[in-house]
Amino acid sequence: MAVGLTGVAQAHDGVGSTDGVINNAQATHDHDQHGGSGGHLPASSDNVSLVSKLQLDSVEGKIADVGVYKGYAYLASWGGVGCDNTGVHVVDIRNPGKPKKAAFIPTTGSAPGEGIQTLHISTSAFDGDILVTNNEICGDGGVGGMNIYDVTDPVHPKTLANGVGDFTLGNEPTDLAREIHSVFAWDAGDRAYAVLVDNEEGTDVDIMDITDPAKATLVAEYDLDETFPQIVQAAPANLTEIFLHDMVVKNIHGRQIMVASYWDAGYVLLDVTNPKKIKYIGDTDFTDPDPEPAESGLTVAPEGNGHEAEFTLDNRYVIGADEDFGPYALAARNVTDNTAITAGQGIPLNPGTALTGGSVYVGRACNGDTAVPAGDPATMDIAVVERGVCTFTEKVANVEAAGGYDGILVFNRTGSDACDAQSGMSVEGTLPTFGVAPRSQGFAIFDQPYSNADCLAGTGPQALPVAVGTKGDQATFSSHFDGWGYAHLYRNERGKMTELDTYAIPEGHDPAYASGFGDLTVHEVATSHVRSDLAYFAYYAGGFRVTKIKNDKLVEVGHYIDKGGNNFWGVQTFPHGGTEYVAASDRDYGLYIFQYTGRQ
């Protein structure tokens, strides 16, 4: 997926949209992600021992994140493939070679996913072990916010808080807290806090005081690209999907330091010692051209997608994992005007193909609007659709029902979070569908004047001022390989952090592996708790991977792919008997436990 931006706009200002635009962490999971590709790589292993594995669910794609604490593993039972049996599996791993099911915590109507963490907090109100989980509503009775459980006795967890979080939306009170994509908690001495990924608002960094877990309260919320505009990368033009996806907080030299994975704004370092007054420390930019594909001879723009990151044990480095499920990017132009069209692929072209045709304005293409006129089956016609009122899927269905079109381009609506902003899109249908393009580009296709200032002020045209059925400029769209998501090694420093190296599995930037071998993007990294140079990766169908930092480079030193393939989501280290083990969650199976056996 390649996306772009004309002018300066924030991709997630205001309240989150529900039409399929990708402007929050949860929306990334709807974009043919987390299980969109079949097949797998062949079984192989090197310097990694499989200690044990335990099947937890027979439904493919049901298992999500994993956390480990004091001899127990906690695995999310996700709602992305159905809302049945959502909750948290508790697994006894006190004997890593013989894991066994210990308990299940149901979350009826809601589903945890990325946010699974257990820790000890000791405050005046509570002294014990807690589990924090995120909630994304998937069915009746679901709640948003986070859940907090007392797992001091892991076999008999007790609910301390259910569905607590931000109970406002656009400054209006709501009955349910905002849905959240992830959560991370920390003990700050006499107080304890948790940070939540708000899926529904531009202020998507929500910080809760959980000193008394049964009385958790919201103490601050931030829109990082508004609070710290220096994190927004000016070029290339495609880095516009700006929102929080995940984060960790670590005590470094007595300060609570967060690394926030802020998608197309990269990785952001913040001092959150005082949650009510957070301070900017540094952030990353995505190198252009993208350095990892360049190693394979490809010259492409960086994808962005800062998904998850961790500090190394010695805090010298930050390792970031970019999640990218689209190995093909889009190039698009207005042929008549010889100008770029900045849009992503909602429904992609066939890999390596192109589509060129004349444009036809079809309005909003919503049910009840002016009917979409039929295209000409004898020519290549591209339906140009205005965003607004209904979902992208409804628009596509109406264009397809009209017949005669070969592709669809959606351009943006009015609104403070729209106008000349560009966003990705989640949509279902058959015809290749591109968008969401900046509003000015939609107007230009039909030679209409446009003022972004008027659009943002609400004084510009509320609809493209041409009749439905009007023909416009020629446009061309082409698909090119740009590879899967991969990892970065950054120096932990103030200001713009230096990118030292990138790491991808060999298949990740080989067009021969663009389909038929599963999702070959990285998902998460867990750094070693005993060595400063080791890191472990959950690499979806790429398996379990181990890297070592050598001379400021990420070098693979081990891997494991099971017979029949893997689909790893989460990864977490834990100690046992003086040895470091690694728990990994396989989305289609359950829990794997590994040990790195390479040279020390």
Model-assigned labels for residue ranges:
Residues 328-480, 491:
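Structured lumen-facing ectodomains of secretory-pathway proteins
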Residues 5-334, 383, 393, 465-600:
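Feature marking well-ordered beta-strand scaffolds used for ligand recognition
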